[in-house]
């Protein structure tokens, strides 16, 4: 029988942090998330990374998203990206994104893949492909990042992979 999940149970399974540690001791997450129409996804992504113990969290996104997230979560670092014609993250931002120091890349929430025009969907596929293959750490592919990766694979391309592990986090609708 599984144990009852209580606050005490959860706290007993969270390791104590060494007194001499600092935020750099607990990893750095780079979240590539959000678009002009989907700002909340980026905010929830960053908040989740911070709450689960990431030492440093950087959000790579377009200005309206960065403004909304920084007002709510001032501890988040920001990587401003060039906007595309529809308020998305332009692939022109890939070199800037890859220059960020991170141990984990999270890509996908709020990119708006399913709501995009054909041109914008192609740009999102480019983001996913180049960011994953150019990343030296582990990566989490979620939401619209999964949809873009599925589209790449449906076109006969291999699933792009980072240097370390790739974690896929589909919900039931994304698994079909």
How would you describe each model-predicted region?
Residues 1-7, 60-176:
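Glycine-rich phosphate/dinucleotide-binding loop and adjoining beta-alpha-beta core of small-molecule
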Residues 1-32, 36, 165, 169-173:
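YjeF_N-associated NAD(P)HX repair module
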Residues 21-86:
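Substrate-binding N-lobe of the ribokinase-like
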């Amino acid at each position: 029988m599984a144990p009852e999940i209580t606050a005490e149970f959860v706290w007993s399974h969270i390791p104590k942090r060494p007194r001499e540690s600092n935020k750099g001791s607990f990893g750095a997450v780079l979240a590539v998330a959000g678009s002009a129409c989907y700002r909340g996804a980026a905010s929830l992504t960053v908040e989740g990374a911070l709450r689960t113990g990431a030492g440093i969290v950087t959000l790579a996104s377009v200005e309206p998203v960065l403004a909304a997230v920084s007002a709510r979560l001032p501890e988040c670092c920001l990587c401003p990206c060039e906007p595309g014609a529809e308020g998305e993250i332009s692939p022109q931002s890939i070199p800037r994104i890859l220059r960020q120091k991170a141990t984990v890349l999270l890509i996908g929430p709020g990119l708006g893949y399913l709501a995009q025009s054909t041109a914008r969907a192609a740009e999102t596929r480019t983001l996913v492909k180049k960011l994953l293959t150019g990343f030296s750490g582990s990566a989490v592919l979620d939401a619209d990042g999964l949809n873009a990766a599925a589209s790449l694979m449906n076109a006969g391309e291999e699933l792009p992979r980072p240097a370390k592990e790739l974690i896929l986090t589909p919900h039931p609708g994304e698994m079909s």
